[in-house]
């Protein structure tokens, strides 16, 4: 994520290029309560370490959470003293999951870790196995959607992406040799969206051909992949649907892949402190109310446990 970006909820345009950035820069934004004169007890501050791709949706989720009474799985209000979330100050640090994980291991005082994948929360549990017998298990709070995007082509005539339609798209370029058609995807070794895009192309028997002909441009992360496609540096790009929705891209410019055609892009979180609101907020993330916000932002819903 670009270091110039200090996230403020009114900057949605910049959030697109920063989402899933995978960089080592850390950006912090606060959602501050109306507590009297700003005097907030430590128990009224919830510190969240969040993957950069959540910068466009998490502020909305936090606002909704603070606007309602404390949530529990049974849909019942808990102790009245603990139900006013508007008095809770929530501090969010956005960065790559890897950097956040390193900060947590170095003792950073986070209460909740929201990763861009399932690997880091699982690794945290493994590390804590011998020291914290009461550690909570990871939970899945979001499932990303993959899309093929072209900023200068009309993709509306194509109803579904398969081997035949991909060959037509990637080999047809007016007034140019077919080998000049470039496609970008995020680094499959580092980015969940890139790994899923690679798996999709392999399933359609197109990955090796594109790679061997040097037409497959590997971006550092999903944010850079979006930038390449958005600026027409490449003809096509495998990007996150949430990026397209955030950027208000016309639907005719992209195709959403069928969810069953690539490995699920699941994002897990884990409570890493005894803060009561950390558990409460983690449960809210999995609620129908929060999931509807994720769906509006371009994610697939997660079944409420």
Predicted ranges, named:
Residues 130-132:
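Short helix C-cap/helix-to-loop transition motifs enriched in small/turn-promoting residues
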Residues 1-9:
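Bacterial N-terminal signal peptides that target proteins for export
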Residues 20-89, 93-94, 98, 105, ...:
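Exported/periplasmic ABC-transporter solute-binding proteins
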Residues 13-14:
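Residue-level signal for mature regions of secreted extracellular proteins and peptides
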